């Protein structure tokens, strides 16, 4: 399958891919953060920063980013077996029902969008139960010739922005405090991307029991703004 080769265009495609206006519903998920606030674990910006940095370095860097790299390589080489293997591997790494459903819903929404944006390879994933955000994100990155290193940082930055947006509503944080938190997260995002891209297969894997517990308890939380 052909890819675009204009570097400037690839950069703008990436901006579109991580834009908060992308119609995939990511804003409706907090990945357990809502329960963590409700339980009193996160009361201020410093606590939120610790929560986010822990996930960056102990979950996203050893799980999502190396899997993203392998999915990207699989799409580039048209290796359908590898695409499905790493998609299933990622799904197995999602520790709760809510986290699995979040990944599937957002992934299927991105599949529908990419199909409508003239990436026909996305079409079979619209109803695929193992469709996930990383799988379809990797497809777009491969076909739009976005450099993997830049795409990995952007992947983490989009996650971070979504989490900070949720924290602003839930803690609550002021808008300036939210922007200060994003400023603080810029360096850890780059470090986590580099860490994840350097991992060998046998080094992949990680998780945070606190996040898994928060996500599990969120399923029965009485009053909720977010779907996870």
Curated annotation (Swiss-Prot):
Required for maturation of urease via the functional incorporation of the urease nickel metallocenter. InterPro entries: UreF (IPR002639), UreF_sf (IPR038277). Pfam families: UreF (PF01730). One of its GO terms (molecular function) is nickel cation binding. This is Urease accessory protein UreF. GO terms for cellular component: cytoplasm. Belongs to the UreF family. The gene is ureF. The keyword Ribonucleoprotein does not apply. Keywords: Chaperone, Cytoplasm, Nickel insertion.
């Amino acid at each position: 399958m052909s890819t675009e080769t204009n570097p400037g265009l690839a950069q703008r495609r990436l901006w579109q891919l991580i834009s908060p206006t992308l119609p995939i519903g990511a804003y409706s998920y907090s990945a357990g953060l809502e329960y963590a606030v409700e339980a009193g674990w996160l009361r201020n910006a410093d606590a939120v920063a610790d929560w986010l940095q822990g996930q960056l370095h102990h979950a996203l860097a050893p799980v999502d980013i190396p899997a993203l790299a392998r999915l990207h390589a699989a799409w580039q080489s048209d290796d359908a077996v590898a695409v499905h293997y790493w998609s299933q591997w990622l799904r197995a790494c999602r520790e709760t029902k809510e986290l699995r459903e979040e990944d599937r819903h957002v992934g299927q929404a991105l599949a529908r969008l990419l199909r409508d944006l003239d990436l026909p390879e996305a079409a079979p994933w619209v109803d695929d139960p193992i469709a996930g955000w990383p799988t379809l994100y990797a497809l777009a990155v491969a076909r739009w010739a976005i450099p993997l290193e830049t795409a990995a940082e952007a992947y983490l930055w989009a996650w971070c922005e979504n989490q900070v947006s949720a924290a602003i509503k839930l803690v609550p944080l002021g808008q300036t405090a939210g922007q200060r938190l994003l400023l603080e997260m810029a360096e850890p995002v780059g470090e986590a991307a580099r860490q994840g891209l350097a991992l060998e297969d046998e080094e992949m894997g990680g998780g945070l029991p606190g996040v898994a517990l928060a996500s599990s308890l969120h399923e029965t939380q009485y009053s909720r703004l977010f779907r996870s």
